[in-house]
């Protein structure tokens, strides 16, 4: 088995043509970033909505995905600062303590780089981007995303789960899978808790 951090490895090599020995496997699916990168997830959802917005029989409601803005994308960055300067945002903040979070768009996981967009953080972000005037000039891979304050819980705990599959053959199709496992947050979820940042991290 070969492990590589070179994302574009598969761009320059053809599989199953003497690249590996018969017993060797490659542990990445070409193009997997379209599924695993947060910024590309946003792009794919936006493209889906644009493509099917005029087809009522398709699922074109974006409520299944929280409102997201990639701040290294000028258009989305402009939209974000227009939004947080709007009356709508002011009203949302009056009802919700933490309407947004910011996170690293790619190259980070397990909650690293994730921050609540509270008043101090919002002030820093406005200063850094000069309240939107620097959109398109700053290319940090940061995105702002609406926080889901009423998540699905198990016995009051936030959770995630992992399921692993191995495609041993495509012709005939042979797939092995493990039943998976569930990870629960140590503390029960409480949006008003003093430990609120605890619930935003992926290692809880």
Where are these regions (language model features)?
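Conserved N-proximal alpha/beta basic substrate-recognition cap immediately N-terminal to
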Residues: 1-99, 106-109, 117-122
């Amino acid at each position: 088995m070969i492990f590589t951090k070179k994302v574009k490895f598969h761009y320059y090599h053809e599989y199953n043509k003497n690249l590996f020995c018969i017993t060797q496997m490659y542990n990445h699916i070409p193009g997997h970033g379209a599924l695993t990168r947060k910024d590309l997830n946003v792009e794919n959802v936006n493209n889906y909505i644009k493509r099917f917005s005029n087809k009522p029989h398709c699922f074109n409601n974006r409520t299944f995905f929280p409102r997201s803005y990639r701040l290294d994308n000028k258009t989305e960055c402009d939209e974000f600062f227009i939004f947080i300067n709007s009356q709508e945002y002011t009203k949302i903040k009056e009802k919700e303590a933490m309407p947004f979070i910011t996170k690293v768009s790619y190259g980070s996981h397990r909650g690293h780089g994730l921050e609540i967009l509270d008043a101090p953080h919002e002030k820093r972000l406005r200063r850094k981007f000069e309240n939107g005037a620097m959109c398109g000039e700053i290319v940090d891979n940061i995105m702002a995303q609406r926080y889901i304050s009423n998540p699905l819980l198990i016995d009051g705990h936030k959770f995630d789960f992992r399921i692993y599959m191995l495609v041993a053959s495509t012709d005939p199709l042979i797939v092995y899978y493990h039943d998976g496992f569930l990870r629960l947050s140590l503390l029960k979820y409480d949006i008003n808790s003093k430990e609120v940042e605890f619930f935003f991290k992926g290692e809880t």
